[in-house]
Swiss-Prot record:
Pfam families: Methyltrans_SAM, RlmL_1st, THUMP, UPF0020. Its main location: cytoplasm. The keyword Cytoplasm applies. Its EC number is 2.1.1.173, 2.1.1.264. NCBIfam families: PRK11783.1 (NF008748). It catalyses: guanosine(2445) in 23S rRNA + S-adenosyl-L-methionine = N(2)-methylguanosine(2445) in 23S rRNA + S-adenosyl-L-homocysteine + H(+); guanosine(2069) in 23S rRNA + S-adenosyl-L-methionine = N(2)-methylguanosine(2069) in 23S rRNA + S-adenosyl-L-homocysteine + H(+). Belongs to the methyltransferase superfamily. RlmKL family. This is Ribosomal RNA large subunit methyltransferase K/L. The keyword Translocase does not apply. PROSITE patterns: THUMP, UPF0020. It comes from Shewanella baltica (strain OS185). The lineage of its organism: Bacteria, Pseudomonadati, Pseudomonadota, Gammaproteobacteria, Alteromonadales.
Length: 709
């Protein structure tokens, strides 16, 4: 009898141990990411050909304690390597594990390589050559807790590579993972009609058809690790292969199970058909191009086993939440009598099904941890009797308080916005504390920004609430889910709001009181236009006629545009960012503004103020709350530094000039007493700069009008 280890992804151990036991293996023992077992050579061949779950089978050649580099070398040297492979065969060592004396896997592999080469030489045999790529004989070594295990890769390339896959879709499912889904769902034990409405390249259905037709999964593989092993018995192996071929031929003819697969992507369906044909099971599977939400049950009962899209796979969050909710609704209403088994890495998506799982298991799709949930749908089950809206979401089910509030807000603000002449505005700002988000409407898009939740609220709770918000929004305000953009906002730290989020751009042109501005909805946390400063910008425009205007910390120059459109004699726009200066120029061009009277300066604003000798009639400044940019000479804190900043700015202000100063620090306290002593008049103008869509959040910013005393 020989000792083996069958490796598999984490979460497969139980299923794999059961499979090995059914094959007839003895001394079956589960371990981490695999199972140890004992078998004869003939049984080992059969397991290698027939296992649907293992990734690799290795033959254990040596196992013993190892506490030094010398012991590692001796352990490898004591193996009779010339009896295992020819010196004409290339070899390689795959070494795993560190600890104690061994802190480098390359060192471990090198010691074993040296021992193998020395063993050949000491037996007066010319040494074999090492090949790092595609070696003919592969040594598999594992070091853990002071024990070294040296083995031979018996099976060869990963066993999930059956040989039928031509190319993969964008998010391929490994074959042995698909097989484990079939095993753990209960389908393999009691095969019946099988449906996969997100079939992709067909892996789940093909693996199921191979099971039902009694086809060995390794039958189409062209290489096995034991082929260059000197103890390989070709006759025994060939007998096992021929038996498998005969069973496959008979199995396809006898198979009466029906398989149905569909996908919305016609290219993937074509690929699935090619893969099924390569696997020899195309005649057993009916494939078609279809939206999963339009399918109907092909039988009164059966299994629906699938790997639908999720965050790490395909699609965006808002659309996926809607999809999962609608799937759950469809399953409950139309698939009574069926079992549903789904693999997904996103708990929020799974919870959006609104179904109660019979079983929940953990599986790994590569390195990605996933939940595999099994649901029994009873024939008389329905979600509820209230009508479902056309897009599949019943507002009464999902976050009713939030849905009702934002629906009311949207209706009220839409009329107001039209009258104001704006098309970008805020429709919800954490009105209900449990739903701690801001929702901004930009033309026919919305951006949802999640505020950082208090540490006292469990993460699972905040995630569920956010999922409910994203589910409720489309029906509540009548928006397509693919026009919903999700962002996460934390309390501002330095220049965090200016950091790039996404290389892709979604650019729009918005209108505000006759001015046009370019928006980038996806590139940064902010879009290029601070909506809460809308009235402040208009005020700047109203005060600009015939005046020399300066805009500091200008961002994308929107206040400068209003000043220019308001008839300013000149406009100087200063910002430290080249990106935003270029953006400001684009905004000027959008509004047909050009000429030498419009100056754009890329500079550290604080240094620019110190160096400036010009006089201005109107200055607008909206500095960051805090900044420690590497491009600034010193850090800036608006509370700490505002007196020095304003006293410096007043020196640039003409005798009858005005300074509009704004910031977003929530607990900002203006040092009026000190400024008054410096002959500076300060007046708070929050009441005229807070837009209607921000009335629910009066502390969003504070604005001051400053003049000479």
């Amino acid at each position: 009898m020989l000792n083996f280890f069958a490796a598999a992804p984490k979460g497969f151990e139980y299923s794999l141990a059961q499979e090995l036991t059914e094959f007839g293996a003895t001394e079956v023992k589960e371990s981490v990411a695999g199972v140890y077992f004992t078998a004869s050579l003939a049984l080992a061949y059969r397991i290698t050909l027939w296992t649907r779950l293992a990734s690799r089978i290795v033959l254990v050649i040596y196992k013993g304690s190892c506490e030094s580099a010398e012991q590692l070398y001796n352990a490898a040297y004591c193996v009779d390597w010339p009896a295992h492979f020819s010196n004409k065969s290339t070899f390689s060592i795959d070494f795993h594990g560190t600890g104690g004396f061994l802190n480098n896997t390359q060192f471990g592999a090198l010691k074993i390589k040296d021992a193998i080469v020395d063993r050949f030489r000491d037996d007066d045999i010319e040494r074999p050559n090492v090949s790092r790529v595609d070696a003919e004989f592969k040594v598999d070594a594992h070091f853990r807790n002071g024990v070294i295990t040296i083995a031979m890769n018996f099976s060869g390339p990963s066993l999930h590579q059956r040989g039928y896959r031509s190319t993969t879709g964008e998010a391929p499912l490994k074959e042995n993972l698909a097989a484990n889904m079939l095993v753990r769902s209960g389908w393999q034990a009691a095969p019946s009609t099988l449906l996969d409405p997100f079939c992709g390249s067909g892996t789940v259905l093909i693996e199921a058809a191979l099971m039902a037709a009694d086809i060995a999964p390794g039958l189409q593989r062209s290489r096995f690790g034991f082929e260059h092993w000197r103890r390989h018995d070709k006759a025994v192996w060939q007998e096992i292969v021929e038996e498998a071929k005969a069973r496959a031929s008979l199995g396809v003819k006898r198979c009466e199970i029906k398989f149905y697969g569909s996908d919305i992507d016609s290219r993937l369906v074509a690929l699935a058909k090619r893969n099924a044909e390569n696997a020899g099971v195309l005649e057993l599977i009916e494939f078609k191009v279809a939206d999963a939400l339009t399918i109907t049950p092909p039988a009164e009962s059966g299994y629906l086993i699938t790997n639908p899209p999720y965050g790490e796979r395909l699609g965006n969050v808002s659309e996926l939440l809607q999809l999962y909710y609608q799937l759950g609704d469809k399953f409950k209403k139309e698939f009574g009598g069926w079992k549903v088994a789904m693999l997904c890495s996103d708990i929020e998506l799974v919870s959006s099904l609104k179904l109660k799982a019979d079983k929940q298991m953990k599986m790994f799709n590569g390195a990605l941890e996933c939940a595999f949930n099994i649901y029994t749908l009873h024939a008389n089950s329905t979600r509820r009797d209230t009508p479902v809206l056309p897009d599949g979401v019943d507002i009464a089910d999902i976050a009713p308080a939030f849905a009702n509030r934002i629906k009311k807000n949207a209706k009220l603000l839409e009329k107001w916005a039209k009258k104001e002449g704006i098309d970008s505005y805020r429709i919800y700002d954490a009105d209900i504390p449990e739903y701690n988000v801001a929702v901004d409407k930009y033309l026919d898009y919305v951006i949802i920004q999640e505020y950082m939740a208090p540490a006292t609220i469990p993460e699972a709770v905040t995630k569920r609430r956010l999922s409910d918000v994203l589910l409720a929004l489309p029906s509540a305000i009548g928006i397509n889910p693919n026009k919903m953009i999700m962002k996460t906002r934390e309390r501002q730290k330095g220049t965090s709001q200016y950091q790039k989020l996404d290389e892709r751009k979604l650019e729009l042109i918005t209108t505000e009181y006759g001015a046009k501005f370019k928006l980038n909805l996806t590139g940064y946390l902010d879009t290029g236009l601070f909506l809460d400063h809308r009235l402040t910008r208009r005020l700047v425009g109203q005060k600009s006629k015939g005046r020399r205007v300066l805009n500091l910390f200008s961002y994308t120059g929107s206040a400068s545009v209003h000043a220019a459109l308001g008839g300013a004699k000149s406009v100087t726009t200063v910002d430290m960012s080249n990106t935003y200066i270029a953006w400001a120029k684009d905004n000027f061009a959008l509004n047909g503004l050009q000429g030498k009277q419009y100056e754009f300066v890329q500079s550290d604003c604080m240094q620019w103020i110190r160096d400036c000798n010009e006089q201005y009639d109107l200055i607008f400044i909206d500095p960051p709350t805090f900044s420690n940019s590497k491009r600034m000479e010193d850090s800036f804190d608006v509370q700490r530094d505002h007196v020095n900043l304003l006293s410096s700015l007043v020196k640039l202000l003409s005798p009858t000039g005005e300074l509009v100063f704004s910031n977003n620090k929530r607990k900002f306290k203006m040092d009026i007493e000190t400024l008054t002593k410096m002959n500076i008049n300060v007046t708070n103008i929050d009441d005229v700069t807070l837009p209607m869509d921000y009335k629910r959040n009066p502390h969003i910013h504070n604005t001051w009008l400053i003049t000479h005393a």
